[in-house]
Amino acid sequence: LTACRLSIYELDKRLNEEEAYYTNINPEDYYKQSDLLGTKAYTAVDLSVSDSIRKLDTYVPSVSIRLDQAKAEKLGQKLFKADRKDFYKAFPDLFSGIYVKSDYGDGTVLYISQVQMDVVSIEYVTDSITGIKLKSKVNEEKDSIQYTGRTFNSTREIIQANRLANDTEAIQKCIDNSDWTYLKSPAGIFTQVTLPVSQIAEKLEGDTLNAVKLGIPIYNETSDKKFGMSMPRNVLLIRKKYKESFFENNQLSDGVTSSLFTPTSSTTNLTEYTYNNITKLINDCLKDRAAADKEIQEKKSITFQTFNDEGKIENHTVNNIKDWEELSDWNKAILIPVLVTTDASSNGYYGSSSNVIGIQHDLKPGYVRLKGGLKGEEKDSQGNPVYPENILKLEVVSTNFGSTKAK
């Protein structure tokens, strides 16, 4: 029941539809304090609503903000005078958008399922056939008027950019922990996985790679908090080189550049993120290595780009495949909590099924501890792992001359 407050401002410039916006966006660049449209004090539970209504299945909790009357009328006049032709194209120039700011209160998280703008206007009552304005009463000159309303829902076509900030010291403390690793959303910690692609290729020795299974154990968390952070349930394993373009281009997991973990509906307690077959992803890594080796042989060097820990691009030029392997992130993958959108389709014989139609960064607060950590990279003088309990295991199935074997 913590008291909170929202403020809404009108944007003074358009968001570029061709540009990708990240959680470090600076809202100050897009609005002025004087362009305040409205404010609303609220609590997570609206006590003005009776228990009998709140318990109804049809009840939907909401926070409604009434916009400043003068500014709403000014906007209405601009929209009314605008050219009706291709109005949807002209609308962003007339109204660039809004910035919703939480400017009072903490400790409260609202999960927003829908955003809508309700517009109320006054119009003349007309005859449905002739279109002639009707009089309010018989033998009176005064025209009859009525209130009408329209609802405009926010859809995926509307750019929604979120500003998120974390406690950098607390985040870094988690990252520096060598006993395990973390996933934390939103915009917090993504775990990097180093895949033993070279070792797999050496072990195969010409065998056909059939299946590669990766399991990432989850450490159980105990908490007595009623409203604690939940564990991410949908996690994307994606090659590091594609983690930016995947979300910018609204791509789906193809099994080659990425693999998606989604639990079944019957799964209650997660103990492991399991990727049953990342064979195509491993082969994609090997394909990159072969292409790099070929370019080095032909051109004597290769130039490539990587992203550093701050997300900035770094350029590299090397003249041997060993240095390329060391710097290129060719065998690196990232674990990212995601929000998965599905559609529903039915089949008379097999029942209903669903297809993934969208994958986005999960903006719901959540975290989990995973097996791994920097200790898994430590080796003794003979090259053996010092902490084998921190190393993840891959199950590899290959075929050689008609026989199948697991390694």
Where are these regions (language model features)?
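Secreted, disulfide-rich extracellular signaling modules
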Residues: 1-407
